[in-house]
């Protein structure tokens, strides 16, 4: 049913549907979970949508306004399961709960939206991906430049960047991978983000500069944004202001866990565009999965905090050699302790996200239990860390801290096995509060009291079927078989008649019931009060807890890299401010882990006198693997990891560009060749003398002569204008003549051994040129008919002899 039809003739709807439509009109773009007793029900278009998304039954809720009401529902106690699925699909949900009866005659229960869930603003553990950041982003464009802001409410992280091109924006979106993106209604580059699951057009008013400026200063209790480095940066102020305003409105509260704003200086890390990240398969493979990626090999962290941090590092390798060398030194120092440390770190819970829920006051009793168990192991962690002679590890140890006061509080205040929610009671530990213990004892003793009362009355009345029972509707009651009703005293009041029994009440039992129920209510109210006080007591420690979580994350990453270095036989790289890359007997970090035979090691030397390496050889001969492994080793070195090589010297690298693999972009009408030329154009315009450039088979998408001409001219541009460190693979033998023309070029090749129509690859790079591409021999491996291969061989001989 269309929205306009639903809204028409409101007077013809039932009171309940009127209430639903009124609430739904406030959240038109969200699924409205409308509580009806023990179920959340959805109606009309929402019902049809959730039925399709979750494959649940679509039924009907009678008629209203003379039309069938489509309906679908989920049990309240299983709602988190369904909410998790919907959030992963990019859906947003408004949770509408029952409040109280407002009209005794009509019995229409008051309802209101108590919670809004969007993919980018969730903090609940069950709705989050354990090992992934959960960013929401906002974009503002002005004068062909962009302000880009990201916020992870589950971690308390808030960052901004100034971006100078749409290509760089795409790269930053790929790096941060936001679950939700906000953009202004006049945004002209929607095509950059339209393929993502959850994008939201926002009014220009939400990006207002003055309002954004005030909001940010109010959030951080400042009078200027100078301290964050963005006072005059209107682009990022607009983006950050819109983002902050949106998250506050969705969260229906202030954001005490957002304590600082980090300006992301793009020049601090090695730049990699979207194409580079995709072709190198750093955290996602070509299919969008995590397997067979650099992250899959390197990320054996034992905490979810560490896993998230390592992926952040992999997406932003550093140019700051001081930080990188500190990490290398730490990885080396940890090599004798990684087993002990990983054993302890496995017991560390997600303190980073628990901190955020503490600040937002949404932490569950189980969060407190997890925090308590984490704080309990810190002394043992310190004992090991004190043995390690490393300045950086000492700095991490001091940031981790001890938190004896918080631990003491949690041990005294929180039960060993509390209930899931505070509303269920049983969260506050015994002996923490005398009044609470007394109230609880009333209920505990009630069983004994009821048992004694039952035995006494049973004996007095001599009724064998006499029993005292309880249910939530009528409370305590006496149940007696109908054959004994003649023995009932006059002061017994009948309250219910069943087929074979009757139920009674007596004043004494009712008085005791009120006493028990009153004690339960008072007990629960007191528990809630004490629970809130625990948040107040912990609040002064929140900033140190956040710092401790970050330190534990970094320790986990460094310990993990130390284990990887030992287990995978990695070498500590030398980071040099000088120009060039020297790798001796290097290996591909991912490919070597999946081979059944030993990986063939290869070296590479790039310097001011050898800036470009042209590589020839057969398809499947190892050219692409070789080029990728060099880039991956540079990335590994840049995050503080040891690398797969016997010796590695990495110079100052500012950007990595790759043009490897081919694909059409049919949605924008671009052919494979056009995509190739656009990517090459981007490289030629943006690569510097400190950039690493990897190009696979440039010019293959057009005629041989034109392709060769383009490859020749682009190569000369890279040599003489960009002066970048370049590896270029080709099947154009004529391109290798550049070695004679340009003094900075060197030819290398991968060779193979051919027998009849069969081929064996050697995977070893050597000086010189491979004059054959062995295309027909490689084609034979695909299963082409022998007659086709023989015909192709004859034609090749004919062409070569012409």
From Swiss-Prot:
GO cellular component, one term: cytosol
Keyword DNA damage found: yes
GO biological process, one term: mismatch repair
Positions of ATP binding: 617-624
Domain of life from the UniProt record: Bacteria
Keywords from the UniProt entry: ATP-binding, DNA damage, DNA repair, DNA-binding, Nucleotide-binding
PROSITE patterns named in the record: DNA_MISMATCH_REPAIR_2
Entry GO MF terms: ATP binding; ATP-dependent DNA damage sensor activity; damaged DNA binding; mismatched DNA binding
PANTHER family documented for this protein: DNA MISMATCH REPAIR PROTEIN MSH1, MITOCHONDRIAL, DNA MISMATCH REPAIR PROTEIN MUTS FAMILY MEMBER
NCBIfam families referenced in this protein's UniProt entry, alphabetically: mutS1, PRK05399.1
Its job: This protein is involved in the repair of mismatches in DNA. It is possible that it carries out the mismatch recognition step. This protein has a weak ATPase activity.
Name this protein carries in UniProt: DNA mismatch repair protein MutS
Organism ancestry: Bacteria, Pseudomonadati, Pseudomonadota, Gammaproteobacteria, Enterobacterales
